[in-house]
Amino acid sequence: MHIALDVDGVLADLAGMIIKVYREETGVTIDRSMITEWEFWHKLSMTRQQFMDMIVRAWSRWIEIQPLEHDLSEDVEALSKVGVVDILTQRPVQTIDFVKQWLKHHNIRYRSFTWVPLKTSKATFVYDVYIDDSPRLAEKLQNTNRLMFLYEQPWNRNVNSRSNIIRVKSLDEVVERLACL
């Protein structure tokens, strides 16, 4: 079984860091509950490019980005026992080295690291299982035979579960569900 594991919003709390950087740069505090859509930068009156630049600034401070779960290393190791785990991540190219440092710092082991350019869909990379928070990826995969574990986040709450799109709140839950397959 080949497993594609996302970073932002699944392993790393990029949203928390974006909130912090935005507050530092503008003096305006936003709450995580405001992030109810994938393109939430519109609510901040930002362009896509301005938001991508903010992501680069956030990841340049990678040591400050918190993991979303306290036992990530163990969870990814458990995933590796049920399949081959690859990191499949879509991001500005300038953040790749920062992300790799973050993964190493948190002792997250994986077989390969695949960067997906911003204009490309992760769905073009064929895996048996995807663990991701993207509502766009869920939309692309909904009529396929590929399984997606949609990591629960405020920006994907409007995605309906389907037979192959399963909502999860933790990587532990993914491991449990995969063990039953």
Please report, for each region that a protein language model flagged, where it lies by residue:
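Active-site neighborhood of HAD-like aspartate-dependent phosphohydrolases
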Residues: 1-51
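Short acidic-hydrophobic, aromatic-tinged amphipathic segments that line or gate anion-handling sites
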Residues: 113-116, 165-173
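Short, acidic loop-to-helix structural element flanking the phosphoryl-transfer center
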Residues: 57-87, 92-100
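Acidic, Mg2+-coordinating phosphoryl-transfer loop and its flanking beta/alpha structural elements
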Residues: 131-169
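Substrate-recognition "cap/lid" segment bordering the active-site pocket of phosphatases
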Residues: 90-142
